[in-house]
Structures are given as structure tokens and as C-alpha cells.
Amino acid sequence: MTDIAATAEMQAALLSRALPYMQRYEHKTVVVKYGGHAMGDIELGKAFARDIALLKQSGVNPIVVHGGGPQIGAMLTKMGIESKFEGGLRVTDQKTVEIVEMVLAGSINKEIVALINAEGEWAIGLCGKDGNMVFAEKARKTMIDPDSNIERVLDLGFVGEPVEVDRTLLDLLARSEMIPVLAPVAPGRDGHTYNINADTFAGAIAGACKASRLLFLTDVPGVLDKNKKLIDELTVAEAKALIKDGTVSGGMIPKVETCIEAIERGVEGVVILNGKTPHAVLLELFTEHGAGTLIVP
């Protein structure tokens, strides 16, 4: 057998094995939160766009939600605005929220749309303001003061939490064979614009759409056990236990908590996976073993 024939046979075998998984997700909604290192790598960005295009061509209804923290920080520095933090969280004043909206909804959003469109699909860039899709309220965050051990309220300015999601526009776009690319910016009923954590925003969107899967592309392979080995699958109860016993710690805690909240809103399964792996989305959805940690009810 020639090398060309062997390669063709291998590709055919891969497609054959992927078929049952393609059928499983046909006509289902999959929300993908795109962030981390992959957003800063041109080739990984192209591979991600190709994955999203292939999902659509396979009959899946993908929705992309993206972050952009490093890009926001870079723009603030460029404009001579000092980034302020409270308890490790960015404080977003009026001037900052205007820049956040410009970077997320204006710059990054359109770059992702262009990448997907270059793969032959029809993507459209939106944020929570469009079609009154998402309404937010000022986030209520607290922290324990390390000196006094007293809980205090953090004033993060125009940092919000999604409290209302209307899926009407998203359903319309799905029927129109379009791929929504969403920036985590939303209005409040008070007339202010709010910057929302992209993970939280993605969880709210996935919950409202009763998504089959919510994928979080991160810079880590997934949830690790005490021996630093990847855990393939967890139930919500098991995930809560890992947080309680300290196995899940640091920045992974809010990530796992967001996964749990999404499942409680009706998402069938949430996956934390490494976005630095080329075609991580396809590996997770269309292969037997997946590519990260799946959290299920």
C-alpha cells in the first residue's frame, strides 16, 4: 500500500469512528468559551475557527463566548490608565468599562468572527446588549480581610453578573445557520454597561439554551487529582468534594464552581480542557476518550 493510500485509509477510519459522536451532537447546542493562550496564538486561533466551522457543518449548533483579559490590560496600559484590583479582581470604573467594551465587542470579537468566516461559515459578532440578550446587575463580591479576619464588601465598579438571558436571538441565528460569537458585555436595568467574567457569561448562555455541552478552553488539561493526573469525568457531588478537600484549589475553584452552576441551570455536561491542544474541541466531542475533564450531574 502506498503512503497516500495508507493515509487515506487512516483518515477514513478516523471519520468512521467519529460518526456516532457526530450523530450524538447533531442539532444540539454546544457553547464554547474561548480564552487563554489559544487566543494569542495565530495557528491555534485558525485551528479553533476550523473546529467551530466543522461543528456547524456537522449539524451542531455552536455558540462561541470569548474573554480578553490580557488584551484589555494591554489597551489600558497603552492609554496610560492604571489597572486597579480588589481582592485579585479588576476594578472597572466608567472609563475602563468603555475600553473593555471597545476591546471585547469591537476588536477581539470581530477578529474571531473573521477567522470563522474564513473557514466558509457565517459568523456574527454580538454582545449582551444586542437584542436585549443579557441583562446584568452589579456584582456583589466579598473577601475576608487577612488582618482583621472580617468579611468586607468589594466595590468593583461596573463588574456585573448576568441575571436575565433571552435566547430568542440565539434561536433565530441557529435557524438561520449562523454562528453567534459573543462578547461578555451587557447592560443593566439601571442603564449602565457591565463587564462580565467570560466564564460566568458562557455558563449563563449555556444554561439558558439548555446546551448539550459547555466547553471551557483553558491553559490546563482539566481537573487534576492529588497526584496531578487528569480526571476524565466527575459528577457534581464529586466535584464539590474535591473543592472541599483542597484537591481543587486556587484559580480552578471558580472554574469548577461555574461548571456546577451551569449544570444546575440545565446544561447536560461541562468540560474543562486545554485550548493549547490543536483541535481540542473536535477531540473532545468527536472521539471516545475526549480531551479534558467532563463534569456531569
Curated annotation (Swiss-Prot):
EC number: 2.7.2.8
Binding site residues for substrate: 68-69, 90, 195
EC class (word): transferase
Keyword Ion transport: no
Functional pathway: Amino-acid biosynthesis; L-arginine biosynthesis; N(2)-acetyl-L-ornithine from L-glutamate: step 2/4
Pfam families (UniProt xref): AA_kinase
Catalysed reaction, written as an equation: N-acetyl-L-glutamate + ATP = N-acetyl-L-glutamyl 5-phosphate + ADP
Cellular localisation: Cytoplasm
Keywords on record: Amino-acid biosynthesis, Arginine biosynthesis, ATP-binding, Cytoplasm, Kinase, Nucleotide-binding, Transferase
InterPro entries: AceGlu_kinase-like_sf, AcgluKinase_fam, ArgB, Asp/Glu/Uridylate_kinase, Glu/AcGlu_kinase, NAGK-C
Annotated site (Transition state stabilizer): 33, 255
Domain of life: Bacteria
A single MF term (Gene Ontology): ATP binding
Coiled-coil regions listed in the entry: none
An example Gene Ontology biological process: arginine biosynthetic process via ornithine
CC annotations in GO: cytoplasm
Amino-acid biosynthesis keyword on record: yes
UniProt similarity note: Belongs to the acetylglutamate kinase family. ArgB subfamily.
Function: Catalyzes the ATP-dependent phosphorylation of N-acetyl-L-glutamate.
Protein name as annotated: Acetylglutamate kinase
Source organism: Mesorhizobium japonicum (strain LMG 29417 / CECT 9101 / MAFF 303099)
